[in-house]
């Protein structure tokens, strides 16, 4: 089953899923969790 979070380096723009890393955030510029 797919986890309900965004893996490091995966595209995140346009989704409301959180980053799997709680210390990361979605960078709209890089379009990935940083």
Curated annotation (Swiss-Prot):
Domain of life: Eukaryota
GO cellular component, one term: extracellular region
Gene Ontology terms for molecular function: calcium channel inhibitor activity; toxin activity
Disulphide-bonded residues: 5-20, 12-26, 19-33
TM annotation in the entry: none
Keyword tags: Calcium channel impairing toxin, Disulfide bond, Ion channel impairing toxin, Knottin, Neurotoxin, Secreted, Toxin, Voltage-gated calcium channel impairing toxin
InterPro entries for this protein: Assassin_bug_toxin-like (IPR012325)
Chief place of localization: secreted
Subcellular location: Secreted
Keyword Transport: no
Family: Belongs to the venom Ptu1-like knottin family.
Domain comment in the entry: The presence of a 'disulfide through disulfide knot' structurally defines this protein as a knottin.
Name listed for the protein in its UniProt record: Toxin Ptu1
